[in-house]
Regions:
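Catalytic cores of secreted/periplasmic lytic hydrolases that degrade extracellular macromolecules
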Residues: 2-67, 71-185
Length: 185
């Protein structure tokens, strides 16, 4: 009976350590920043964490992801980033009561989605690009670039023209990409 108690106790201790290790290794990274460079570093850490869930061919090209996060959230300074953890400018068209009303557009037929964490908004974005028909040309280009072993992020900018209603979106992405590149990313 004493040996059984010891085995149970050791088993519980082992399970506790396993839980702690899994929590530390697989928990979402902290998302803190006070300037543009720290914002990009935080997005990068989140992307590293999320990439573990995707096959290599399903991963979003990192520089594209960083560029869109910076542009869509103004480096994490937008109202949607601060109040709704939405770094990617993601709208919702159902359950409008759960999203944020766009400023100056109270009658909008959409809301800006809210997320429990900033990393969760990035994961949602990754799933959008990997599953929605709107982004099939993006996925085809990603596959082609992978086969050719090139990474031309500028080609993606034009394929994501329908990510935004702004006709200048590809040019804005290019400008933001240059900013990020100048920061050393």
């Amino acid at each position: 009976v004493n040996n059984l108690k010891h085995y149970v106790l050791y088993g519980l201790i082992a399970l506790l350590w396993l839980f702690i290790i899994l929590f530390v290794v697989f928990s979402e990274p902290a998302f803190g920043y006070s300037n543009n460079k720290e914002f990009i570093q935080s997005v990068n850490k989140c992307a590293d964490y999320l990439d573990k869930r995707y096959k290599k061919e399903e991963r979003i090209p990192r520089k594209l992801l960083l560029t869109q996060a910076a542009l869509e959230s103004n480096y994490g300074r937008s109202r949607y980033a601060k109040e709704g953890n939405n770094l990617m400018g993601i709208y919702q068209f159902k359950n409008l009561h759960t999203g944020m009303t766009p400023a100056g557009n109270q009658n909008a037929k959409f809301r800006v989605a809210k997320f429990q964490s900033k990393c969760q908004s990035i994961e949602y974005y990754m799933n959008l690009l990997n599953t929605k028909d709107f982004y099939r040309s993006f996925r085809n280009e990603r596959e082609l670039q992978s086969k050719m072993r090139v990474n031309d992020v500028n080609r993606y900018f034009y394929l994501l023209y329908n990510y935004s209603t702004n006709p200048e979106y590809p040019q804005l992405l290019k400008k933001t990409y240059k900013e990020i590149t100048n920061m050393g990313f």
